[in-house]
């Protein structure tokens, strides 16, 4: 499994909607870039100026909403992930 460093997290991105609410099937070119996913791994935290480590507010298993064009897309063992900083996460979905 991937282990992110510092204040980074690894997210398994949730798939974009295939249909609109009215049932119209969307072609790939019309789909919005997904902005939510499930956290599968978290880093050890951000190092502050005084040298102490601040733990992350998110945890493995959290479903989050993140900025649209943030992070780096990677494929690991056939699965697509997104690695991004905690500051790119906008909200936790409960």
Curated annotation (Swiss-Prot):
The record ties this protein, via NCBIfam families, to: PRK00364.1-6, PRK00364.2-2, PRK00364.2-4, PRK00364.2-5
Q: What is this protein called?
A: Co-chaperonin GroES
The record lists the lineage as:
Bacteria, Bacillati, Bacillota, Bacilli, Bacillales
Concerning its family, UniProt says: Belongs to the GroES chaperonin family.
State the UniProt keywords alphabetically.
Chaperone, Cytoplasm
Q: Which SMART domains match?
A: Cpn10 (SM00883)
**Summary of the function given for this chain in its UniProt record:** Together with the chaperonin GroEL, plays an essential role in assisting protein folding. The GroEL-GroES system forms a nano-cage that allows encapsulation of the non-native substrate proteins and provides a physical environment optimized to promote and accelerate protein folding. GroES binds to the apical surface of the GroEL ring, thereby capping the opening of the GroEL channel.
Pfam families (alphabetical): Cpn10 (PF00166)
Q: CDD domains this protein is in?
A: cpn10 (cd00320)
The record's subunit annotation is: Heptamer of 7 subunits arranged in a ring. Interacts with the chaperonin GroEL.
* Subcellular localization: Cytoplasm
